[in-house]
């Protein structure tokens, strides 16, 4: 059996969904995905398009193929539109969470052992959703506030995330 590859380069077309949703994605053939020899159902990679800044993402199954969603910000950064053939470099994502851990949240978890246990008891996908949510604000005070809100939410809801409730809690004023 061949060794799993750490990096794969290929060309593919940036495709727009035919449903009218506006979603743009890269189609990845199953033969390319097979080169990574993923061991679990989660297929996380770091993707670079046309030599642009790399981003962490999932290879999402779609019949016999896989796809990677490419949002407008990333399309604009590399100057591509639907129909463009692009150079793609995929590297197997071997990071702990599949997204960077915001520094502020890491510090909150370090200081709050109960919050740390509750966060790490969540499924990998829920952890990534929280990390993505907490990495969005540019303001450091808001990132700290939101990290504290998330930990409080976990404690108040027996380690569960109740999406609608959490989103409302995140809107409350800091002071």
Where are these regions (language model features)?
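Mature exported/compartmentalized surface modules and terminal targeting/interaction regions
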Residues: 1-3, 81, 85, 89, ...
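A positional/architectural concept
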Residues: 2-67, 72, 79
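Functionally constrained cores in energy, signaling, and assembly domains
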Residues: 14, 43, 70, 74, ...
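Short, surface-exposed beta-strand-loop junctions and turns on beta-sheet-rich folds
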Residues: 74-76, 137
